[in-house]
Amino acid sequence: MDDCLSAGIAYLETNEDIALASPYAENALGQKQYLCKRYPSIFTFLVRGFAPSALRRIFRQRLALFEMHDLSESTPTDDVTIASGCFMLCRTDKLNAIHGFDENYFLYFEDFDLSLRLAGVGKIAYVPEMKIRHSGGNSANKGWQHIKMFARSGVRFFNTHGWRFFKQQ
């Protein structure tokens, strides 16, 4: 995990069509985290955020598809739709072309929105040679205020990029 930036910069230098590179991530316990996502459906978010664990187990395959569990741990791909905001290595010219983050998002969905807008000017890549330790996350599990902020940003995201109730990418 020592040379994440060097690996990312080298990847961007040899792949000029990439607008954003997302790394391989582990939490503090060394467990893999899934930073790349497919376009979500409302149903997937409801199951992921609010369903009891028994129901989540029933939809385990659907959730794994959303979180792109099928990505290789050794081979980069430029077939990513959304990258987590915990680490985004972006080309400055591409970020400037879309005017950066949309200030209308607060705390949630700003990374989803940025990823989709960057995909309009380049590709989003998963680069497993870039390795990080991510100790954050789970901000959605912090009470009703966060649920309200999540819902507000979610409505903004889906109003902007399109509502999908059951079908995900």
What annotation goes with each model-predicted range?
Residues 3, 72-76, 81-100, 104-131:
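A short, conserved alpha-helix in the catalytic core of glycosyltransferases
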Residues 40-80:
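Short, flexible, basic/aromatic active-site loop/helix in glycosyltransferases
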Residues 35, 46-49, 97-98, 117, ...:
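Residues that scaffold the ATP/ADP-binding catalytic core of kinase and kinase-like folds
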Residues 2-37:
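Conserved donor NDP-sugar-binding/catalytic core segment of glycosyltransferases
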